[in-house]
Amino acid sequence: MKTKTLTRKEFLKLAGVAVGTVSGVAKFVSTAQAKIKESELTQVKSDFIYSCCNMCGGQSGIMCRVVNGKLVKIDPNPYNPNNFSNISTDFFENVEKEGTCICPKGNAGISTLYDKDRLQKPLKRANPKKGIGVDPRWKEISWEEAYVEITKRLKGLRDNGEAHKLLWFSEDHSFTHIQSDFCKLFGTPNYSMHSNLCDTARKASFKMVMGLDRPLMDALQSKYILLFGWNPLSATKWSHLPRIITRGIENGAKMVVVDPYLSYTANKAQEWIPIIPGTDGAMALAMGHVIIRDKLYDEIFIKDWTIGFEKYAEYVKDKTPQWAEKITTVPAKTIERIAIEFAATKPQVVDVWSGPGQHSNGVQGGRAIAILAALVGGCDRPGTLLIPDNKGNKHIEVEPDEIANKTLKEKRFDQLKELYPFGHKSGIYCQAFSDLAEGKGPYKPKMAMIVFQNIMMSVPGLKTVEKALANLEFVVVNDIFLSETALMADIVVPGTTYLERYDLNTHWVTWPVLGLRQPVVKPIFGQPVEYEFVTELGRRLGLKEADGNDIFWVGRMSGERIADKTKWYEEFLSKELKEGAPKMTLEELKALPGAVWVSKSGTRYEKYKDAISPEKLADSILEGNIAYSKKPDGAKDKPIGLIIEGGAAVHGFSTPSRKVEFYNADFAKKKDAWGRPVDPLPVYEPRDWQPDANYPLYLINWKEASHTHTRTQNNALLVELKPDNPLMVNVVTAEKMGLNNDDLVWVESIYGRVKAKVKLTKGMHPEVVGLQHGFGHWALGEIAKDAGTSDTVLRPCKADPLSGQAIHKQCCVKVYKA
């Protein structure tokens, strides 16, 4: 704990409740930057601990006030750029004047910490039958009993050469390295994370074009912001987004949002363009047609830094605005005007997220949108899509022993590498659960470890997921609530909140920044922190590295045997920090202002022009104008750079050609998960589920600042903001159907039906209905239970065939009175 002695003025700034409105969209808590000086010390004292939030994946910096061991308030960390801006000059020059912010979820974390419905002790299932509505007949057991039973099951798999039959599912931002280390040392290739439920289609789209999977929007310096299916002013991926977009608009930018639903972001845009779900790629191709037809593209950038432009130009020759209008319902004149405005306004930025991505055609649609940035030279320049210099802690890879290596050679159960040419390392949840339910796949898994994941509510295809979990011999869930997924478990062990544990957070800004998550209070039920739980399992199983290193006992800094698991983990983190960009220990990070490491390098632009060192170039293999690194045996390995006109060797983009790629002939050599060749071009094809006479409406879902996925609906403070999720129906559509506000209706697809409450709006495409994702719990807690509607039963458990992205937004329904 860090004790600060503050002036009265600073105390009021930091500890007072200051609620402001960012862009008029959602309530954010803001505080002015506080600089503590020895000369300002007075008798006013308070204890603050700097940390990082984990109420969502944004990982905002937080400052927690603790009194007598109890958390009483959460404020934004005034030192963390993630709470302010993704551009370094903006942060350094303006944060002290404006102050930082956190979203409602971050401010409400205290309610989750002290939720009366939290799990307190391990539970063991007494009823072997599993399913929705089945009473598990829980029996409370001790931690020792839980460890013994879980270890016995794990040991049985490993001793029988079946370690690969363990499936491990983890949340993305919490103690992931120790979990993946455990899986590798145990011998299972089946470590998976949440990402493939979120934005892996976007990742694949941008990687195919620019070579990296997460460029960041520089809205602050842009003059034209074009967003496809993204709601950053409310579904705040990072808490700095509302501010930089607002400041960009104040600085003269026009914002245009393409979305079937009038989201908070669309509401604040100068123009909202409603579109048929899953047709965004067609609109992007038509825009490309106009930009090329009118010669509005950046000729120099395309000549020097792209490949395949001619083939793309030929492909979009007939992709006219009139062609796209028939597909999207967006008027041809609107498409033409937006294309011209976008290309003519410098600098401009275009971005796409989960709205278009979570369809069967999401990757190619996103790729068509990403190419719009290339057409206008909007890559890694101020006001465009930036390549983040994302450096932080370094994961120190472990070396598994001979026993583990045997089973690590088995295929992943989800067949990530074999089936999904642009799959993400997070795995393919939908493939795994579909095969598990149907008895397919390369082998039959026997056990699952599910950490901080409510899979029953978050994976599409509820009935499939239910059957899949029931088909496993043994399921362990580690969570803070008795969730719907926990009800399918054989043993449930209570976890901790982010306010009770450590983590390192490499922040998604454009220059290197790393924030520390550290315990604000001790685990309130005396339960082990998740990394202690994993460490204890590793110790009981006797897992070691190939050289015999007793890795779960030996400290990574001291090399000495450490019994205290928290101290052991502190050395684990220190080693990652020392080997990574910060080059410091955990204690040194704690001592920095706000417990956040902020690189002085700042945001850099046009990094594709960075020179390759003469030494690196001399040790490379040149083929044509591309430099390749060497394998240990001297053979050609990966491309590392590009020889440009004049003979200079530069980094280029991280694609095979080291240029932005409109076209890649090698894609045709790959097949997607459905057995089809991958098109070298960003082709448009209709999504594979369309409305018909029986199910005439598109159903979509979205997220808002009020809740995170399916995990915050028991948070009393957030439920005050958003208690449920009515079905939003266009007023014209509702009139035709005879529906009014607050009517109870059935929403039915070919897979099932759910009951919902109607809310009429003009802000919805008339062929579309939709609701906020995350509600409709039958477990989790007293507040969450029976509030709102879940739509997971309405969709199949299905993944996009290129990236493995779960298809959350592709659904056709009929709506009728209940």
Regions found by a protein language model. Name each.
Residues A269-I275, E500, V513-P523:
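Short beta-alpha connecting loops at secondary-structure transitions
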Residues Q179-I245, I249-A253, V258, A282-L285, ...:
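Extended redox/cofactor-interaction regions of prokaryotic respiratory oxidoreductases
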Residues E530-L592, T710-M728, V732-A818:
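Long, contiguous, secondary-structure-rich segments that constitute the structural scaffold
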Residues M287, I307-Y429:
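Active-site phosphate/pyrophosphate-binding segments
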Residues Y261-Y264, S483-R517:
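Flexible glycine/proline-rich, aromatic-decorated loop/lid segments
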